[in-house]
Amino acid sequence: LHLMPLLQMPHPHNDGGYAVEDFDTVDPALGTNKDLENLTRELRKAGISLCLDFVMNHTASTHRWAMAAKAGDPWFQAYYHLYEDRTIPDQYEQTVPQVFPNTAPGNFTWCEEMHKWVLTTFHDYQWDLNYANPAVFVDMTKSILHLANLGVEVFRIDAVPYIWKQLGTTCRNLPQVHTIVRMLRMVLECVCPAVILKGEVVMAPKELAAYFGTPEKPECHMLYNVSTMVNLWGALASRDTRLLKAQLDALHALPDNCWFVNYLRCHDDIGWGLDEAVEEKLGIDPQKHKEYLYHFYEGNFPGSWAKGELYNYDPATGDARSCGTTASLCGVEQALEKNDTIALDYAVKRDLLLHTAMAFL
């Protein structure tokens, strides 16, 4: 059972709970730590493991570490990436992509209390942690062990590819990220070996499998099967299974320690991260294909049955993502609105087709 973020968060701006104010405490609006402990106990009796998100990349700007940093404490200022002028931030901006170019442009936020620039990859109220400071890893590990002691058995480690920063790079998928995940895995294997790490790695297919580590040096126990999810939706819209087949062939060639979570939709958007090298080999223009897919699934293409929403469109790059439930993207919503029973039958068949494909992978 994977519950959405429930740790203490600021209100109202909290990115759906992914801006964490206290990693050790359940948000008072949702309950108490005792409630969480009671829940995990009852779930375990029923043979159910509880999964919670553990946000590794950042804290809320109202976290006690951030508040101490704002108050001038140098110890906690070292927990974040802080700069007195734009010299280094401007160097980062030359190579680091923006996650939310429309709603949260740039990768840095000015903090008036400190008179410093803060690295904020996601939103201005989410301060990126500095894992080059060993104290950050130690304290974050203490928090994940605390939650394990409350009975949480699976941790979805959020935004893990972003956690290491280095000038002159994209600050994505750097080698140090794998070292940190490996260290966390080693701690868990020593202290609570039944606990599982589920990596949220929404990256290009070639980057994905590396987060399993190797049989000798394992990292995540399991990963979301992002590539198959994206390729299934792509095949449905394009009526072309070649990309899907190539991706499945690559998947089956991975070592036995690779354990994927197959899924069609989740709370996140669909990022159209297809394998561009394979697309080009098949004579498919990667950019035009991506544009076709996100326009198709927003319903803005002749013959589209979908009624999703375009998300995070960046006119500079032509990049965008898609939002919508499985039913809406398969055509159920549009068919019901038009009272079209034939279209509804096709929509349900699409839904069943995708679930059948995912179930037997």
Residues covered by each model-derived region:
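Active-site and adjacent substrate-binding regions of carbohydrate-active enzymes
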Residues: 1-361
